[in-house]
Amino acid sequence: MSPKQEEYEVERIVDEKLDRNGAVKLYRIRWLNYSSRSDTWEPPENLSGCSAVLAEWKRRKRRLKGSNSDSDSPHHASNPHPNSRQKHQHQTSKSVPRSQRFSRELNVKKENKKVFSSQTTKRQSRKQSTALTTNDTSIILDDSLHTNSKKLGKTRNEVKEESQKRELVSNSIKEATSPKTSSILTKPRNPSKLDSYTHLSFYEKRELFRKKLREIEGPEVTLVNEVDDEPCPSLDFQFISQYRLTQGVIPPDPNFQSGCNCSSLGGCDLNNPSRCECLDDLDEPTHFAYDAQGRVRADTGAVIYECNSFCSCSMECPNRVVQRGRTLPLEIFKTKEKGWGVRSLRFAPAGTFITCYLGEVITSAEAAKRDKNYDDDGITYLFDLDMFDDASEYTVDAQNYGDVSRFFNHSCSPNIAIYSAVRNHGFRTIYDLAFFAIKDIQPLEELTFDYAGAKDFSPVQSQKSQQNRISKLRRQCKCGSANCRGWLFG
């Protein structure tokens, strides 16, 4: 017998959105014992068992319409007939800056579309219905109705009469939603797990995401969308500056670490690689991974050995390129067919370090669980840390936490590749996944890598290349390159 699922009660409907024909397409639900930040937009079909809630909302609208027909009423519906809304926007745009008018117009366009947000669409496609409980439901009219009655010039008797009506409505609804008369609704859904940003406007969502970008370390990362009216990628995504170790992941043991004794002033001597103990894992270290400009050499294998905190050299050492971080300003932008992508705002010569692939470091067991869920969605952000052991202990998951690299798209003809950068030489289960340019990249050129692993980016064939976990689903490739394979993971 499965455990009983926790249910959540609807307190009231607080708003609605109409389609172009004036029909209701979404209701904004206030959940009992939850704040307005947990409000969710639900389609009418999800309220099939909440006739009392709908009836009260309709009564409230009629009452407000009768008491104040002026469109400036504080309780005027958020999405009136499209024509009237657009007219209102036109009237107010004269005193609003151009940038804000543009964001408002996009917001109006978005609200008038007969589709949900991306997250809502996914929930509907998977046929997950909202938990709307009618047992002992309390319908509480908005307190602002009482306050607003004073603004409308109502007498004390009228206010008292409204209070009595509210009590009568509440009692009648409790009776109507008793177990004897309530219908059985669809399976419950936890409001706290839903998109908590649906109440924000286009402008607010975009600015909130840009605020996240401003907090990223290093050169600026900007956001632009010249394709459609999606304000930004998911606001639930959190940017991090280093790996986020999860339960069961063992961090490197400092007792097993060692470093080199290279110069503390100029750092390692690029012309004398045999002196640096950090390269001892190479059979015959003939050169460092980097040249004098800090670019990865064309003859470098898939693994880069950098210095670490136990070395005598400083952070300015020429063998600490990845550790010094990103030097290129980047831009997250909306592509026409591939969702969000990333491009460089400056010219990047071949060999330039771009950034690292970050995320949660999870165990192989946890990765297996998540991999199944991600395959259901048709997408995965998992990278196995298996460069030194095919049976990898850990995997990097950038689904919810990560770097700008999380938005890198695939290409069958990529301009960047991923290297395994090791600096904890006695501990190879966790290492950096570092992106470098493998050809000259022009300003505003999209940064792409081969999701299946670039087999030929290095002339050194004795080492395998790092690749992300292969999805079980074949997906059509939209990279558009001349040598496109046609399918991802196929």
Swiss-Prot record:
Zinc among keywords: yes
Alphabetized InterPro entries for the sequence: Chromo-like_dom_sf, Chromo/chromo_shadow_dom, Chromo_domain, Chromodomain_CS, H3-K9_MeTrfase_SUV39H1/2-like, H3K9_Histone-Lys_N-MTase, Post-SET_dom, Pre-SET_dom
The entry's keywords: Chromatin regulator, Chromosome, Cytoplasm, Cytoskeleton, Metal-binding, Methylation, Methyltransferase, Nucleus, S-adenosyl-L-methionine, Transferase, Zinc
GO MF assignments: double-stranded DNA binding; histone H3K9 methyltransferase activity; histone H3K9 monomethyltransferase activity; histone H3K9 trimethyltransferase activity; histone H3K9me2 methyltransferase activity; histone methyltransferase activity; histone reader activity; methyltransferase activity
Entry binding sites for S-adenosyl-L-methionine: K338, G339, W340, Y381, R406, F407, F408, N409, H410, C477, K478
Region Autoregulatory loop, residue ranges: 453-472
Binding, Zn(2+) 1: C260, C262, C268, C276
Positions of post-translational N6,N6-dimethyllysine modification: K455
Swiss-Prot/TrEMBL catalytic activity: L-lysyl(9)-[histone H3] + 3 S-adenosyl-L-methionine = N(6),N(6),N(6)-trimethyl-L-lysyl(9)-[histone H3] + 3 S-adenosyl-L-homocysteine + 3 H(+); N(6)-methyl-L-lysyl(9)-[histone H3] + S-adenosyl-L-methionine = N(6),N(6)-dimethyl-L-lysyl(9)-[histone H3] + S-adenosyl-L-homocysteine + H(+); N(6),N(6)-dimethyl-L-lysyl(9)-[histone H3] + S-adenosyl-L-methionine = N(6),N(6),N(6)-trimethyl-L-lysyl(9)-[histone H3] + S-adenosyl-L-homocysteine + H(+); L-lysyl-[protein] + S-adenosyl-L-methionine = N(6)-methyl-L-lysyl-[protein] + S-adenosyl-L-homocysteine + H(+)
Region (Disordered): 61-133, 150-190
Family of this protein: Belongs to the class V-like SAM-binding methyltransferase superfamily. Histone-lysine methyltransferase family. Suvar3-9 subfamily.
The protein's name: Histone-lysine N-methyltransferase, H3 lysine-9 specific
